[in-house]
């Protein structure tokens, strides 16, 4: 049976294959990097595997995901419908960032998008955030995507009970819970 843990619950084992789940802009990659450092295991940013130049999907994406999950230890984000089943089937821990959307996630995704655009930050394979006006014209603009998909994890994560009943899931509902989980159960699992 799928085990859903609270931020203070001890982990059943030291995690070796970790997924970070949550809506766009919630802080998945930031948390994945922190988990990677704490556990001293590699983090692979799933967006870097997916996006080719000009924001096109890379044809090698699923081959790269298969190579990633074949490894003994890894941390990555639980994204992309085509990869989610494989990622979940090979993970031993999922950390679900279920943070308040209006108070936490929306400001984060807005500020991140604005910062990346203003600074012209190069993301994956030479891509940069598109002009801000595309918010109004592109249904898949990251801010619009974040808003339109903000509730899907409340269905998708519990549905894992059917396909991945042995997967442990830690559900974190606030930035404070994130910090307490990192300092508590995750740090304890490393000792």
Provide a role label for each language-model segment.
Residues 28:
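Conserved lysine of the Walker
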Residues 20:
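Hydrophobic anchor at the beta1->P-loop junction of P-loop NTPases
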Residues 42-99:
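Conserved nucleotide-sensing/catalytic segment adjacent to the nucleotide-binding pocket
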């Amino acid at each position: 049976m799928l085990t859903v843990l609270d931020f203070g619950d001890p982990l059943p084992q030291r995690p070796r294959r970790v997924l970070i789940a949550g809506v766009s802009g919630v802080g998945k990659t930031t948390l994945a990097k922190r988990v990677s450092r704490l556990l001293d295991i590699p983090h692979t940013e799933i967006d870097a595997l997916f996006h080719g130049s000009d924001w096109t999907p890379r044809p090698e994406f699923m081959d790269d995901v298969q190579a990633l999950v074949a490894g003994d230890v890894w941390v990555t984000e639980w994204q992309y419908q085509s990869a989610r089943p494989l990622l979940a089937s090979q993970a031993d821990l999922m950390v679900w960032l279920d943070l308040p959307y209006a108070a936490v996630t929306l400001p984060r995704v807005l500020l991140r998008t604005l910062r990346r655009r203003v600074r012209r930050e190069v993301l994956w394979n030479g891509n940069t955030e598109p002009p801000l006006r595309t918010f109004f014209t592109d249904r898949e603009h990251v801010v619009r995507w974040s808003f339109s998909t903000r509730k899907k994890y409340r269905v998708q994560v519990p549905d894992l009970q059917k396909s991945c009943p042995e997967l442990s899931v830690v559900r974190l509902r606030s930035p404070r819970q994130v910090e307490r989980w990192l300092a508590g159960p995750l740090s304890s699992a490393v000792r």
